[in-house]
Regions:
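Surface-exposed, glycine-biased beta-strand/turn segments
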Residues: 101-216
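Extracellular ectodomain segments of secreted/surface proteins
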Residues: 24-49
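Short strand-edge motifs at loop-to-beta-strand transitions and within beta-strands
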Residues: 71-75, 187
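Short beta-strand segments within Ig-like beta-sandwich modules, predominantly Fibronectin type-III
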Residues: 63-69
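N-terminal signal peptide c-region/cleavage motif recognized by signal peptidases
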Residues: 17-20
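Surface-exposed, short loops/turns at beta-strand junctions within beta-sandwich domains
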Residues: 78-83
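Short proline/glycine-enriched turn/loop motifs at strand-loop junctions of beta-rich domains
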Residues: 49-57
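Conserved structural position at the C-terminal beta-strand
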Residues: 89-91
């Protein structure tokens, strides 16, 4: 079974706007006591914004979900969620309700490139070492949940960080010489060098680092597991 909950959810406009293809067939769960569904859809790579009644706590597949002081929480779905997830609602009087969600499936752009030299597919060891260190730093940054007073600012809406041509889309993947590469978990936007880039919402910077694959990169946490 693939993981159903992102340890870190990516700040994309997908939370508040319709998704193409299969996502249009997705929907919010049925109403349940103690929880209000505010936005989003149950779809691969998507999120649902929920708001609980006072004292209600949420667990997703047995893992407690972060909630802000107003009861907002995020439910995230993996890019390849091929199994249903279970949301448990824990009421202050001891009652427990559960909701099963089967994310709608999506089709992703897959590019196959064969005949490449091995050096273009498998980097040398020193590069692999740097990639490994980069990955560890990114994981540590994404593990930071608390955004302090800015937690939940994104609930009012997310802004595009820059205007420009979309050059990469969420979920796309390359297969080089038959070897699947890591899927793309974001949106690439091309803009001239020196163009100001704005945060999509208020938050806390958790990483500034020159990464092998993406160059100078900064990560922010917006609270509730969204970064």
């Amino acid at each position: 079974m693939k993981p159903s909950l992102f340890t870190a959810l990516f700040a994309t406009i997908l939370l508040f706007h319709p998704l193409p293809g299969a996502a249009q067939q997705a929907s919010l769960p049925d109403p349940v006591d103690g929880v209000e569904w505010r936005a989003g859809t149950a779809v691969e790579g998507g999120m649902i914004l929920a708001k609980t009644a006072p004292g209600v706590r949420l667990e997703l597949d047995g893992v407690s979900l972060p909630q802000d002081v107003t009861g907002h929480a995020l439910i995230g779905f993996h890019r390849d969620s091929d199994s249903p997830v279970t949301l448990t609602i824990l009421h202050p009087d001891g009652r427990r309700d559960s909701v099963s969600m089967m994310p709608a499936q999506r089709d992703y752009a897959v590019q196959r490139i064969d005949g490449l030299k091995r050096g273009h597919v498998t980097p040398p060891q020193e590069v692999l070492d740097r990639i490994g260190a980069d990955s560890a730093a990114v994981r540590a940054a994404r593990d930071v949940i608390d955004a302090g007073p800015d937690t939940g600012d994104f609930i009012a809406g997310l802004e595009m960080p820059v205007e420009g041509r979309i050059t990469g889309v969420y979920g796309s993947q390359r297969i080089l010489n038959g070897e699947p590469r890591q899927p793309h978990y974001g949106i690439d936007i091309a803009a001239p060098r020196g163009t100001p880039v704005m945060a999509p919402a208020a938050g806390r910077v958790t990483l500034v680092r020159d990464l092998y694959f993406s160059g100078w990169t900064f990560l922010m946490t917006h609270g509730l597991g969204l970064n």
